[in-house]
Amino acid sequence: MLALNYSLYDCFAQMPFQGHTAAVIDLVQKLDHGLAVKIAKELCQTVTCFVWNDSGHTWVKTISKDGSVWPINHGLLGVARNCLGVQGNGVLDTVSGSFEVRTKGNTVTISLPKLKLDIAEMPERLTQAFDIMPVSVREMGKTCVVELRTVEEIINLETDFNRISKLDYDRVVLTAEDDTVPFDYVCRYFSPKHNINENNGSLYIQTFLAVFWQERLQKNNLSFLQLSPRRAIGRISMSEKLIEVEAPVCKTFEGVLKVL
């Protein structure tokens, strides 16, 4: 029997039970992939992050509740808080790259690569799925980003997840400028093909949303609100090649997981 220390963290959350929950499991050494998938499915969090040290490096492997491996994800914020506590800095190594992180109090900052969106046409089936009239449409691979005119349009979306799941895109992100303090833009993120009707708080989408809004607003420092049911907040700082995402992270649970 294995006895594994694990914790739950609410990421992008100023207080518990907001933002997006991630499980973090401390390991003595790397776990067999099949066993890691089994554990992630049993915990049934959106992501479970397995963390171990090897030759001075902190390695992270993130597995979703459907057993797939996720690269950049909100769980990295929880891992940083778990490893560094309330004050520190370090590097997290993953299969998709290394990410510098630091913590101060309940705030975690992580450096991520910038991703660029391409201009795209608005698919007719997308307008049917959301009943919207976009300002602009961007895409990157299987991700579609739709800009709307007002925050109210984002809030009042009527979603048909059955239709969304039949789109050619794996991810659909809707966003709008927010002209009220303290946020610069808002967003919502739908991914029923990944068994997540609406994502509660995504780190990954900020790698391209921040770039989009930097160009649109001509600002290098931005703040965002993800208008999911649990809401998620964060700040962005832009450099030439990287973005820094700063987000509050709350620890909500710790315990021992016994695995037969």
Language model feature labels by segment:
Residues 1-260:
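Active-site proximal loop and beta-alpha junction motif in alpha/beta enzyme cores
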